[in-house]
Amino acid sequence: MSELKELAAEAKHELLTHIIPFWRGMRDDKFGGYYGYLSYDLALDEKAEKGCILNSRITWFFANAYLLYKDGGISEEECEAAGFKGEDLLAEAKHGYKFLREHCIDKEYGGIFWSLNYDGTPLDTTKHTYNQAFCIYALSSYYDAAGDKEALELAFSLFDIIEKRCTDEIGYLEAFTRDFKPESNEKLSENGVLADKTMNTLLHVFEAYTELYRVTKNEKVGKRLMWIMDTFADKVYNPVKQRQDVFFDADYNTILDLHSYGHDIETAWLMDRGVDVLNNEHYREKMTAITKTLTSRIYQVAFDGHSLANECDRGVVNAHRVWWVQAETVVGFLNGYERNTGHSEYCDAALAEWEFIKTYVVDKRNGSEWFWEVNEDGSPILDRPIVEPWKCPYHNGRMCIEVIRRIGA
């Protein structure tokens, strides 16, 4: 379809001329890593805390942008027209990796800190399973991009920490002190509850292990992927409501009636990706039935023909359009269409969502990137920063990379 080719071309333009240059500009050459805060008014705080999740995600992003370049998805000529060379993408990934290795990873107790001061010294020494997972995700992709075996060794050290320190017999635990004593999970709890276990952490451990398995085919990692899929299907997925539950007690009883629209559409394609990487027919059959249902349900209840609402908490819909939810919507519906081309409505939804993003979510101001969130009518919400520990190129950059890889441009 010509519309899909146009989508891929526009995603490539957004990646090359906007997202990559913006995040290259956030590089801190004095203290390492990337600056941690840019306000809505585009005021850079060079002394803001540096979130380790943010730096893992930036490293992942540049590693995958380089892999896209290496695979021919973007050309040297296209890079140079945007003001950089293809090898500059690997240089950025190396810069991020060096910061992770030298500052974010705790050399005394192992694992990765939650955040650092601007100068690379520890600030919040919480060890969170979610955070360990994103570092594995970054290190695995960086290993693929750079061939650096030390990065792979670090990824496996974090894998071992998660499996030895951050699990019980039924799932993944969440938050720990620096020396891995359990603590309460405020960091991954929202909506007025305090969760012992979360869908979000399980999903992103799965995502990280998928990438680690992709680059190694390690049998132990593959077995954990299967275990996570069973846990997801048996504990997290709610077949009656055709959605994931989000927050749980220690025994995986749900503690809040919450439908996270963005996580459901993201999970649908990430689970499909994991099934493809694992290449196990039993799990393909088991999980595909669920991911098809998640995609269909989100299309029915959360997509208004143009964009995706945020969530529904105890029957009340939050209609804000959040940057990461919109980005995952494009990939999720494109994935749904690719796996069943009879569902042309998913293709139309991905195209319509991109129109909404480029019209309202992409910030046209010089020196900015994407708005954090906009109202249902597309007007920006003015108090949300452009960069902070959670606001990163992982969702929107990945959307562009996925669109280019899936469609070609």
Which residues does each predicted region cover?
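Glycan-recognition and catalytic cores of secretory/periplasmic carbohydrate-active enzymes
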Residues: M1-A409
